[in-house]
Amino acid sequence: MTCGPYDRARALIDGTVKPQGIDLEVRVNKSPGRHTKIEGKEFDAAEFYTGTYIADLHYKTLGYTAIPIFVKRMFRHSYIYVNKRAGVRSPGDLNGKRIGVQNWLTTTAVWARGLLEDEYGLDPKSVTWIADRVSGVGDWKPPAWLKIEIVPKEQKQFNLLANGVIDAAITTGTWAPNVHPEIDFLFPNYAALERDYFKRTGFFPIMHTLLIKTSVVEKDPWVARSMYDAWQESKKKCYEWLEWQRVHQTGLWYRALWEEEQTIAGQDPYLWGFRKTRPEVDKLLEYCHRQGLTTRKFEPEEMFHPSTLET
């Protein structure tokens, strides 16, 4: 299995937790391209972009099946940036602008576009989207309404935004504050907005999901649940460590932030499992359909191995 060096995976990485019946070797990879490892079928299990996996639900070219372990979650309010000279004073000003994305299928962009449309009235059809690539799966093609321009990757979205070639960008990079004088957050008060968004929706946006080779779970269906249980146990140990850290952490206000998070999100803020996360998965599937990643709206039950639907 390969995944990033996450605290919630630490007990699996160091072998403290072992999935029942499985001799698991974990290879930690923190490079940005680690998610492409499944394309060569190199690993039996791997974290992968959820948006791309959803786009492949019709084609099934990846050869992997998801379980409801959402390896990475992140709010994306703070990953939407603007050029200060673009005249973008509010999200509504993005209509008709040129907005950069790394790839149309990237889960970060799916959530950010959905957020901007649902909460702030963005019309995606009015925007010219500037992408490094439009890599798809199977015979996937961009929707007919999509106005998209592909720029050479070496031009870099950061430089395009800084130089005013694009007006805004949705990215995974930390480009503000104080990184470049011409770049700023669309939402400078992103922390308060993220708290409000979570309180209203209960969503902590899913980015990466754990996939297992379809050939493995077809031969041994029990593997899906064994891996699910092991990841849950690893997360439990992570929570125990974070609680201990609140009075030992080097960070100045970690205890206050930890206690605030517990008050707002409860004792299990990093939700995994099917039942409790179904509304959020359904919203992501809705966004994927609206944005042309899928030709129909899939149901959450179609996304995961059947043995995990009772979790």
Question: Which role does the model predict for each range below?
Answer:
Residues G4-L122, W129-G136:
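Short, glycine-/small- and polar/acidic-enriched structural segments
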Residues A144-L242:
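Pocket-lining segment of extracytoplasmic ligand-binding domains
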